[in-house]
Amino acid sequence: MIRISNYRKLILFGLLFLAVYILLVYQLLEYELLEGHSEIKSLSDALWYSIVTLTTVGYGDIVPTSEGGRIIGYIFLFLSLGVYGILIGQFSNVISKINENNKLGMQGTSFQNHIVVIGWTQFGKTVIDQLIRAGRQVAIVTRDRANIELLHELYDKRAAFILYSDYENLENLEKANINNCSSVFVNLENDTDKLVYILNIKKKYEDLQYIVTLENANLKQTFLNAGVRYAISKNEIASRLLASYMFEPDVAQYSEEILAYPVTDTDYDIKQFRVLSKNPFIGQEYDKTFYELKKTYNVILIGLVREEGDKKVLHKNPQDNFIIKEGDFLLLIMNMAAQKKINKIFSTKEGI
């Protein structure tokens, strides 16, 4: 059997009701004209009576006098109850459907320069939490409908957009405004699924920046060759930090705390800022910039990244005479109080 949508059913019901209504109006007029002394003498009178009856207004200025006309009057009266019930029910269904579509993300989002996260896991939650604390907007795509309620409870709609979609439906990612995102974090269950997904999604969205975490560090080059910008091994990072705790615990603790997002104005963090055309340090030597930032804002410049061709080259603690150029990314250690000043001086916010 062909499945008919609710909207098509509603249209068919409306046409059927209209046909029955017209038939009853003409039948009413016929009964009343045969009666001879009825107040319903024309089609307009019959229409007027039917309308005030169906809308339950019931002015009582004209009423049928024939037996057949009264029977039709009863039919109009009962129809009015049914029509109201159906209209209220259909209206409730439409509102419910709109709310459900909004909850599932079917209306799309207008987020710009946000992060799209494909897949929902407990590890992904910790990443998303950090991003939102940093003031970034996130679009989360999940194919598990059971996650939708939880995600809406966890995150404010101004910070996170939730999209229910099959991962294979790449067209649906347009609803997450993927073309205008800053990066895509592929957060699927295993490395094989991630690699297959990367190969498929890059056929449609080739120019986006993709990020993955790996269970197997040996696959890093494979993912880079597939077009991933950053492939990070969770085990590799954790093992380095753990080893550091074993022989230089203070360094390990410093590293862990400096990577965490600050909560108070006195908490420190490493941030990167792009050097825009209005940046006051363009054309200035590295050492002079270092001392000026430290003295004026209590900010430590620890390095910079420069785009050289298709690659980004990290310069850790460059030579003193290294000249800062527009488009560079300055890597800075600062607290939240200093960040507010740097945002204003650099005319930009942290990030890429």
PLM feature spans:
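Cytosolic regulatory regions of ion transport systems
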Residues: 1-22, 30-40, 52-55, 61-64, ...
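Structural signature of hydrophobic alpha-helical transmembrane segments
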Residues: 43-47
